[in-house]
Amino acid sequence: MIQKRISKYISRFLASSLLALLPLGAYAQTPRLLPEVKDTTALFRGVAVSADVVGLIQMAVSSYGQYEAAMRVNLKDKYFPVIELGLGKANAEDAATQLSYKTTAPYGRVGLDLNLMKNKHDINRLYGGLRYAYTSYKFDLSSPGITDPNWGGTAEFNAKDVEGNYHWLEFVAGVDAKIWGPIRLGWSVRYKRRLAHDDGFVGNAWYVPGYGKSGNTRLGGTFNVIFELGGAKQPKKKGEKNDK
């Protein structure tokens, strides 16, 4: 009789314990829903102006090059619309053919860079981007004398103010780093793809302002000194006090 009562009490205790554990198990299996964190970064985060050094070096050590400056807008530390303007120049002579080529003309590019860093507010940035570029230019082509292979004799050749234009795309990969205060340095590598062109009646132009030596595709690069106003600062978290 006593054993039956003990067994009855043990059964009730086990049943009560199982019933008490059931809600805990159900709660443990329910995933916790975390509140969605809103992006409180301001849309406009700053603007930067820059100048390319590579073109200046080309002008100093070769017969062609360019002066180039750019302006870049910072949107949410993620998107960077860019406009690039420059002046391309060439004054070259081929030693073998004695052909001289000369041009000076402006060019422009517009496009967008994306910040590829995991932490988009980092003071250093990794970019991927795209540019559309265009130039309309005139060039002079001359030679002191061209020998006729059939009849012999030499005739001068001069073509002045030959009109041409180029449309092309540039695929961009680059980095820039904060040096001090608003001063930054940036590097980019560019793959250029010609879309459409008109070289005038004399054939392919030797040099195209902004594009470089003519051809279907080419690689290029820039090294920029950048002055940036705004951006590159971690946004304050909600409830964080300002520094005194």
Regions found by a protein language model. Give the residues of each.
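Outer-membrane beta-barrel transmembrane domain signature
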Residues: 127, 131-220, 224-234
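Flexible, solvent-exposed coil segments and beta strand-coil junctions
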Residues: 45-51, 86-95, 147-155, 201-206
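Cleavable N-terminal export/targeting peptides
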Residues: 1-40, 230-244
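Residues that define the transmembrane beta-barrel architecture of outer-membrane proteins
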Residues: 45, 63-67, 102-108, 124, ...
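Gram-negative (and chloroplast) outer-membrane scaffold detector with strong preference
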Residues: 79, 84-151, 227
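Short glycine/proline- and aromatic-enriched beta-strand/turn motifs that initiate or cap beta-hairpins
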Residues: 27-74, 224-235
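Short loop/turn motifs that connect adjacent beta-strands in outer-membrane beta-barrel proteins
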Residues: 33-45, 78, 117-125, 179-185, ...
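Membrane-embedded beta-strands that build the outer-membrane beta-barrel scaffold
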Residues: 51, 69-71, 81-85, 112, ...
